[in-house]
Amino acid sequence: MAIDVVEVKRRLHSLLNDANLVNEYLRQYGPTLDIKHIKAIKEARAKAVSTAEEGEGRDPVFEIKVACPVCGLDDIPCYELRAKSQQILKNKFLVPSYQGTSGYKTLDYSLIAVTVCPRCLFASPDKKDWCRQEEAKSQIPANAIMNLQEKIGERKALVKTIANVAAYFSRPRCLDTAIASYQLAISRARVEAWYELPYALYKLGAYSLRIAKIIKDSKGDNTQSLRDALGYYEEAFRTSSCPSEEIEMQVIYAICALSLKLGDQKKAHSYISVFANLHNSRAVEMKEDPKLQTTIIDKWAERAKLLWEDRDREDLFKDE
């Protein structure tokens, strides 16, 4: 007897009461009903959500409304983290983790940091990329906005199985939803990189590392995301696309760390040598301009050297 897909979907909607869960069920198990699979889907979603917000305490997040600079949709929820509500620690790839403090509960803010337009799927964790109250315009230039308008179809293809986009990206978010939000942010940042906007390649690397951490936290293989981040950071260094010296030094440090993690000690050592070259060049410049300093260069050089000294430790990147 032929499978009645419509009837299966109807019953799944009744049992799961969530169109996105129904689509996920069908993607994993096909158009057949199995109580064990339904239970597994529910448990996976509950577990993913519970890891995002833990413990008792006040809510560390407040919501503001923004408007999309690409399609004009307004009243999009943007989740902001309250000042001093979380102790923020960064791993060896400079990706933050969060611990509640001062009476606030622990929340993995990285999971909800990216704001997503439910209409055109423009996405960014930076509220300056959005239109806000008092006629505050997006910092993204008009030519990039036009390109993003033309690429709506590409972004929709990334979440084509999602029935209710607004609900899917609402709070709390499961791990798969968080990854999807960063994939959409990567789509935006690639357009910025095409127009050679400052920090675009740095953002691409940072978003890839957020995905890598989420995958790592869910016990998955994050190697490809780490490789993606390394590639973006190398291109950022090659093109000098980071005007801030602090960010540029972070990029070089991250290249060293990622190279060691991925087993390329030769590359890591070559970028550690970059720090030495930059220090020497700055020392020469300081003879002409005493206001210049090597402080930032030396700070990140020292962090890279510490990793290099521990390069043979098996547990060096156990949390990354």
Task: Please give the residue ranges for each predicted region.
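N-terminal cysteine/histidine-rich coordination modules
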Residues: M1-N143
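Alpha-helical linker/edge segments of TPR/alpha-solenoid repeat scaffolds
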Residues: I3-V49, I211-S218, A254-Y271, Q293-E320
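Acidic, Ser/Thr-rich low-complexity linear motifs
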Residues: K84-I88, A283-I296
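Amphipathic alpha-helical repeat scaffolds of TPR domains
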Residues: A142-S218, E246-K261, D298-L307
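Alpha-helical junction/boundary sensor with strong preference for TPR arrays
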Residues: N143-A144, Y182-A185, A189-E192, Y233, ...
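TPR/TPR-like (Sel1-like) alpha-helical repeat modules
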Residues: K266-V284
